[in-house]
Structures are given as C-alpha cells and as structure tokens.
Amino acid sequence: MGFTVQDMLDMKLFQKANLLWGKGGIGQEIRGVTIIESPDIVRFISGGEVLLTGLNAFLNCSPEEFRSYIAELAKKKVSALVIKQGRTVDFLEEKMAVIQEYAQKTEIPVIEIPFEMPSFPPGSLRFFLA
C-alpha cells in the first residue's frame, strides 16, 4: 500500500492537527491532494484524494445545500477532509454537524488544522512524487 492518511498524520507538519472524526479510515491510501475552491469540486475528483478547505467555498450556502455537497463528496470516497480552522462561515455549527455525520457514517477522516498552519509548506508534498 502507498502513502496513507495515518502516514500523513505522522508527519511533523501535522503535529498540531486534530483528527476529529473517521478514525477507522486512517488506513486509506492517498492518491492526491485537492483544494476545495468551489462547491462543484466533486466534478474534478476521482476518489482517494485528501481535500483541503477553509470552508470558504461553502461560505454562504444553506445547511441543506451543504448537506448535498458533502453527500456527493462521500460518494467519491475521498481519503480525508482537512479543514483549516478560523474562518467565518455562515451556519458553521450546522455544517460541521453534517461533516461529522458523514464522517462517522463513511469513516472518512476529518482533520482540523490551525489557522496559522500553511496548507502546503515547501517540500510537504514530496511524498506524492514517488
């Protein structure tokens, strides 16, 4: 097996990360990394990705719209969802509850990282180049 979510969490870069939900999925292999910049991200992923987001793409959507987006992501069988904390997002508590529900149902790891942590420090993605 290749590089897994557990391998990613074991990296020094992720020492301040917090695994919120989906611990049962940390053995999933990572096949790529994608930043969520728009709600239609599901069109551009094939599965196995780690998705990075500050939830900005979902800033103003309703909880119902957000539930639909997350359901589509779950169908794609992403390897993990990494959420950068500290963003102001409408209905944040409701949206996090939706993420928790799907993470527990599908075992998709949800990892929270501090706001000040850079998403891609130099050299951090070298493990995908092997």
Where are each of the predicted segments found?
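Alpha-helical/coil-rich non-catalytic "connector" segments in signaling and regulatory proteins
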Residues: M1-A130
